[in-house]
C-alpha cells in the first residue's frame, strides 16, 4: 500500500503514499534545525529527501537537488505543507524533463512562504494558541486535569491537520495553488482570524482582569438597613469591566510605544500593592 503511486488529477506520479507520509513526519521537525542564518532551510531540505530520492535516480542529481533547498526558508511551521507539496510537484516535473530551473523552484518557495506566514502567525500564535491556552487554563484553575490535555490535543489536532492536508493540497494542485493564494483568500482568512482573536481576547479581559475600587461614595439607611455605595458599584452600573478594559488598553498603548513588558509587569505589581495599602484597590 505504501509503495502505490499517489493519484494526482487522475494521473500517476512517482511519489508514493509512503513518500508522502514520510514527508509529513519530517514536517513536524521544522524547528529542530532552527538557526538565525537560514531559519528552517535545513529542515525543508530534510522534508524533500523522500521526493528527491524517488524522482532522481542519479546520485549527482540528488546532491544538486538537496543543495538547492539549503537556501533561506522561513514560514509558520504549521503552514509549510502547501509549500512542501508544491515544491515536490516542481521537483518531479524537473526530473521528468520539464523546463524548471533552480530559480523557478526557489521563487515559488519565497513567493508562498511570506503570505502563508502572514496567515499562519496570527492564526496559530495570535488566535488559536491563546484561545486554547485560555480554555485549558480556565479548566486547570477549577482543578480539572483536562485543561492541559485539551490544550495539547486541540492545538496539535489543528497543527497536524494543516500540515497533512496542506501537503496534499500543495502537491495535488501544484502550480494552480499559487494562483489561488494570490487572490483575496489570504486577506479574508487573516481578517477573520483577527476579528475572532479580538473578540475572544475582549471576553478574556473581563473574565481574568479584576479591578475593584472600594472607595465609599455614599451610605444610606432605610428601615435600619444601611446600603453602602462604592465607586465600583457606580462604574459597574455604567459599564461593567470598564476599568479592566481601560487598564488593558493602556498596557497595549505602552507596549506599542516600546515600553518593556518586564517594566509593565513590575509596574502592575507596584500599583496593586500600593493601591491595596492605601485602600484604593481591593
Swiss-Prot record:
Disulfide-bonded cysteine pairs: these are: none
Mind telling me which residue stretches traverse the membrane in this protein? 135-155, 197-217, 234-254, 261-281
A GO biological process of this protein is:
phosphoenolpyruvate-dependent sugar phosphotransferase system
Q: Which InterPro entries match?
A: GatZ_KbaZ_carbometab, PTS_IID_man
Which factors induce or repress this protein, as stated in its UniProt record? Answer: Induced by L-sorbose and repressed by D-glucose.
On whether Transport is a keyword of this UniProt record, the answer is: yes
Bilayer topology annotation: Multi-pass membrane protein
Keywords of this entry? Cell membrane, Membrane, Phosphotransferase system, Sugar transport, Transmembrane, Transmembrane helix, Transport
Q: Would you name any one GO CC term? A: plasma membrane
Q: Which residues form the PTS EIID domain?
A: 13-281
Compartment(s) where it occurs, according to its Swiss-Prot or TrEMBL record = Cell membrane
Q: Which PROSITE patterns match?
A: PTS_EIID (PS51108)
Give the matching Pfam families.
EIID-AGA
Role: The phosphoenolpyruvate-dependent sugar phosphotransferase system (PTS), a major carbohydrate active transport system, catalyzes the phosphorylation of incoming sugar substrates concomitant with their translocation across the cell membrane. The enzyme II SorABCD PTS system is involved in L-sorbose transport.
> Entry's PANTHER family?
N-ACETYLGALACTOSAMINE PERMEASE II COMPONENT-RELATED, N-ACETYLGALACTOSAMINE PERMEASE IID COMPONENT-RELATED
Checking NCBIfam families in the record gives: EIID-AGA, PRK11103.1
Q: What is known of its domains?
A: The EIID domain, with its homologous EIIC domain, forms the PTS system translocation channel and contains part of its specific substrate-binding site.
> What name does the UniProt record give this protein?
PTS system sorbose-specific EIID component
Organism in which the protein naturally occurs: Lacticaseibacillus casei
Gene encoding this polypeptide?
sorD
Amino acid at each position: 500500500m505504501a509503495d502505490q503511486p499517489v493519484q494526482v488529477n487522475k494521473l500517476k506520479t512517482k511519489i508514493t503514499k509512503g513518500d508522502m507520509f514520510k514527508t509529513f513526519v519530517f514536517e513536524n521537525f521544522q524547528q529542530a534545525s532552527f538557526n538565525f542564518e537560514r531559519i528552517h532551510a535545513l529542515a525543508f531540505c530534510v522534508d524533500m529527501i523522500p521526493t528527491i530520492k524517488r524522482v532522481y535516480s542519479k546520485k549527482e542529481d540528488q546532491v544538486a537537488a538537496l543543495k538547492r533547498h539549503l537556501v533561506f526558508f522561513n514560514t509558520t511551521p504549521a503552514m509549510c505543507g502547501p509549500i512542501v507539496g508544491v515544491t515536490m510537484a516542481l521537483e518531479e516535473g524537473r526530473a521528468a524533463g520539464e523546463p524548471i530551473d533552480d530559480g523557478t523552484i526557489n521563487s515559488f518557495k519565497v513567493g508562498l512562504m511570506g503570505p502563508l506566514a502572514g496567515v499562519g502567525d496570527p492564526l496559530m500564535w495570535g488566535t488559536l494558541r491563546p484561545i486554547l491556552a485560555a480554555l485549558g487554563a480556565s479548566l486547570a484553575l477549577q482543578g480539572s486535569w483536562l485543561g492541559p490535555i485539551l490544550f495539547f490535543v486541540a492545538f496539535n489536532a489543528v497543527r497536524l491537520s494543516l500540515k497533512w492536508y496542506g501537503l496534499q493540497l500543495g502537491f495535488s494542485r501544484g502550480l494552480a495553488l499559487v494562483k489561488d493564494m494570490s487572490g483575496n483568500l489570504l486577506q479574508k482568512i487573516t481578517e477573520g482570524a483577527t476579528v475572532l482573536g479580538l473578540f475572544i481576547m475582549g471576553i478574556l479581559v473581563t473574565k481574568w482582569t479584576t479591578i475593584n475600587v472600594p472607595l465609599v461614595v455614599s451610605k444610606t439607611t432605610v428601615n435600619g438597613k444601611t446600603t453602602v455605595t462604592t465607586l465600583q458599584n457606580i462604574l459597574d452600573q455604567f459599564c461593567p469591566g470598564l476599568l479592566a478594559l481601560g487598564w488593558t488598553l493602556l498596557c497595549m498603548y505602552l507596549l506599542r510605544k516600546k515600553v518593556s513588558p518586564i517594566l509593565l509587569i513590575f509596574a502592575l505589581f507596584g500599583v496593586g500593592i500600593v493601591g491595596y495599602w492605601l485602600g484604593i484597590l481591593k
